[in-house]
Regions:
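Flexible "cap/lid" loop of the alpha/beta hydrolase fold
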Residues: 1-5
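Conserved alpha/beta-hydrolase catalytic His-Asp/Glu region
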Residues: 6-70
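Generic structural signal for small/hydrophobic residues in well-ordered secondary structure
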Residues: 18, 38, 51, 77-80, ...
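A general structural signal for short secondary-structure boundary/capping elements
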Residues: 21-26, 53, 82-89, 122-128
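Residues at alpha-helix caps and immediate loop-helix transition turns in enzyme cores, especially N-
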Residues: 34, 63-64, 88-90, 116
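Nucleotide-sugar-dependent glycosyltransferase donor-binding/catalytic pocket residues
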Residues: 60, 84, 110-113
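Conserved loop-alpha-helix segment in the C-terminal half of the alpha/beta-hydrolase fold
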Residues: 70-108
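Catalytic active-site module of serine/aspartate enzymes centered on a nucleophile-bearing elbow/loop
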Residues: 98-129
């Protein structure tokens, strides 16, 4: 039953809807190649269900507050401007460590590196120069 449920959850139609509704600012920019790759990676390897199970069971939501407070290196957050609660997320990180710097990429959502790679590259280069 577990494999059946996993196959439903990682179906191409579910991945496509997630990209259109949650990952991309403009749903018409979703390239079918991205859907193919995500679908393929959900079914390849020795344990493709591991990441899905970890996300569903909230194992990927570790509290890193104490670690962030102690970091004395540069930390830079880059997010999509239309990502839900991005300003709040950045604020929470900077509350832990005021040295954290951030930028948002306009007209992008969850995957700014795919939606606008030129702007992401420009922003990253600006930070490291």
């Amino acid at each position: 039953i577990g494999t059946l449920l996993y196959n439903f959850a990682s179906a191409r139609s579910i991945i496509s809807r997630t990209f259109s509704e949650s990952y991309f600012y403009n749903p018409y920019d979703v390239n079918p190649h991205y859907i193919d790759k995500y679908h393929e990676s959900a079914h390849l390897g020795d344990s493709p269900k591991s990441v899905y199970a970890s996300v569903q069971c909230n194992y990927t939501k570790c509290n890193i507050t104490k670690t962030l407070e102690k970091i004395d290196n540069s930390i830079y957050i880059l997010g999509g401007e239309a990502e839900q609660d991005i300003d709040l997320i950045i604020k929470e990180y900077t509350k832990c460590n005021p040295a954290i710097e951030s930028s948002t990429i306009p007209n992008t959502k969850h995957l700014p590196q795919i939606e606008n790679p030129e702007e992401v590259s420009s922003t990253v280069q600006m930070f490291f120069n």
